Amino acid sequence: MLTIAVSKGRIYQEALPLLAEAGIVPSVDPDKSRKLILPTERDDVQLVIIRAADVPTYVEYGAADLGIAGKDVLVEYEGEGLYEPLDLGIARCRLMTAGPPGRPVASRRLRVATKYVNTAKRFFARRGVQAEVIKLYGSMELAPLVGLADCIVDLVDTGNTLRANGLAPQELIMDISSRLVVNKAAMKMKYGPITELAGHLARIVSARAARER
């Protein structure tokens, strides 16, 4: 049995067609069920539905053999018990700094609000900026508006939410997409089925990319 960890929301919705092409179709609709462990039409695969930030933890500690997680989560996690064999090319967006329009990011000292504390600290340290990073769990756009922070670090897709709150994207930290991650021990113990699934997904991703070119 292979257990795949995935989060509800955009990643799950964009992963569903990809998994379906690999023959992995949930037998239960997670939007209509309270079940967190979902059987699939394949007897050898099940899905566990968890918070996005918890996917790498479940995989690293062996509660799931594989997972689908955004690069933003993986970079912030800083774990060592994972392989990251495949960029699935889904849930694309950008991790950026953002703040009031026309106000450049300070060159020496500033206060930053984000849930990506580790990533933000590394980014500003590389730029030689002394940053006080404040961890928030949501409503990042509010922080600069009420004087809590000079800027934020957050995911940006269309930028509509930023604009609606009087903010603008500033600096790109990294492009984000969702990745397949694998538990290192499971890779040894279940090498055959894991590499077969990863290879199948890789072929699907390559075919999609070829169609989009």
Curated annotation (Swiss-Prot):
GO terms (BP aspect): L-histidine biosynthetic process
Record-listed E.C. numbers: 2.4.2.17
Biochemical pathway: Amino-acid biosynthesis; L-histidine biosynthesis; L-histidine from 5-phospho-alpha-D-ribose 1-diphosphate: step 1/9
One GO cellular component term: cytoplasm
Reaction catalysed by this enzyme: 1-(5-phospho-beta-D-ribosyl)-ATP + diphosphate = 5-phospho-alpha-D-ribose 1-diphosphate + ATP
Predominant place of localization: cytoplasm
One GO molecular-function entry: ATP binding
Domain comment as written in the entry: Lacks the C-terminal regulatory region which is replaced by HisZ.
Sequence similarity: Belongs to the ATP phosphoribosyltransferase family. Short subfamily.
The protein's name in its UniProt record: ATP phosphoribosyltransferase
Gene name of the record: hisG
